[in-house]
């Protein structure tokens, strides 16, 4: 039994003649402890896919199964890290994390909850900022709060929806390493949504492209045959890295060209000759 499984999943919006088919015939299997990355173009339906897996949306048809049971709503078993930090601005770092753990562990004492908060804030190197509010933090620090909040709930699966996309290169690289360090400690199942092929290769066991929408579907998987822990500098000289990267980019370019060709056919404007208004 797969840990996470999507079977023939379709998702559309609208009714009757105004239906937009966002996702079409999505089939995905992720095993326990695996780190899988899905790469795709902006607007291809990646966030819709995340919301289906997390239970924020229901599929139009098909099944989303977590540990063999249908996903019928959100659960702290599946922790989500969004690109938008979604921190409550009137609460401190510690209070933002505390709200999450209080919801996830209602039977724990206040002391136990505070210890959990402190442990995870320390894990993302934010202990000196635990009493600061979001407006006092940089973008990278805010995203680390979001990481701490998601992980402090002790989810069995971590779902990341382009969590590092808005960060500068240095902060992004540091957070990639922090997420990998946390993941490697207990090998929680992880799903990363990204539009960065290099990020996917560095972090994941497998990369699966999502074709452009509408009617977006998953392409072939690419296994990352590079030993862990991975070194970004050394990877540049790794023949498996070069081969995998080239194959993924070539595939994405091909489907991108196909989509452009279809779009041009769909939106060819008629030739209209101007009327002469001269009597």
What are these regions, as identified by a protein language model?
Residues 133-137, 141:
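Conserved ABC ATPase signature
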Residues 152-156:
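A short, proline-enriched helix->beta-strand linker immediately N-terminal to the Walker B motif
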Residues 91-100:
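Short coil-to-helix segment of the ABC ATPase nucleotide-binding domain corresponding to the Q-loop/switch region
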Residues 81, 147:
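Hydrophobic anchor residue at the start of the ABC signature
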Residues 109-129, 181:
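Conserved ABC ATPase "signature" region
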